[in-house]
A protein has these predicted regions:
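Flexible, small-/acidic-enriched active-site or ligand-binding loops
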Residues: 32-73
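Cytochrome P450 core scaffold surrounding the K-helix E-X-X-R motif
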Residues: 35, 80-86
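Solvent-exposed alpha-helices and their adjacent loops that cap or buttress functional pockets
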Residues: 1, 14-18, 59-63, 86-87
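Short clusters of hydrophobic/aromatic residues that line enzyme substrate/ligand-binding pockets
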Residues: 52-56, 61, 81-82, 95, ...
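Structural motif
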Residues: 3-5, 22-23, 50, 68-69, ...
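A short core secondary-structure module
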Residues: 1-49
Length: 194
């Protein structure tokens, strides 16, 4: 990405806890690979800025990486403060709102994982022959595949409802609920598919 969302302490009074944090958009060069190291020309403090990032290993996230980022003397212009002057001290609130979207995204990703597991299990059930019949002909296999399909559809529809709520500025609690439900369902579906 060409930008980072950076939650930074803007009030040195640590007794303000999360109320002393602000959220900034920080531009950076596009990096190649799973780590990066950049320097920035001397900024307002007349010091060369440094930014270094390394990917954090995560299970199941392909095409999307989490990074540990270290900044030293990296200059960010005041206009990059989210919420302009009214955003000072509100960064934590803004960040939490962003996490709500992340919860919905995690639920949607889990629906995709369940769908892929179901399709693999269905293919296996149709092609694995035991005692002269595909195992998909047996009642227990049919019941498991049926339950998988129900959980997938329920998770998908729940995610759609929450997405509509969030588009209307609602659904913070429901975003947490759909993530919890769909991820738990995905555990069962993928376990049974194996």
């Amino acid at each position: 990405a060409d930008v980072l969302a950076l939650l930074a302490r803007t009030d040195p009074d640590r007794s303000k806890t999360h109320r002393g944090l602000s959220l900034f958009i920080v531009t950076k060069p596009r990096g190649g690979g799973h780590g990066f190291q950049f320097t920035q020309e001397a900024g307002a403090a007349d010091r060369v800025g440094k930014m270094e990032g390394r990917a954090i290993d995560t299970i199941g996230y392909r095409g999307m990486h989490s990074y540990e980022v270290a900044l030293e003397d990296w200059w960010v212009p005041a206009e990059n403060l989210i919420g302009e002057q009214d955003g000072i001290g509100k960064g934590f609130i803004f960040q939490m709102a962003g996490f709500e979207n992340g919860r919905l995204q995690t639920a949607a990703r889990a629906v995709g994982v369940m769908q892929a597991a179901y399709e693999a299990a269905l293919d296996y059930a149709q092609n694995r022959v035991v005692f002269g019949n595909p195992i998909g002909d047996y009642q227990l296999t049919q019941a498991k595949l049926g339950r998988m399909a129900v959980l997938i559809q329920a998770g998908r529809q729940f995610a759609y409802v929450v997405a509509r709520m969030m588009a209307n500025g609602e659904g913070a609690t429901e975003a947490a609920m759909v993530k919890a439900y769909v991820c738990k369902a995905a555990e069962w579906v993928t376990g049974e598919a194996m």
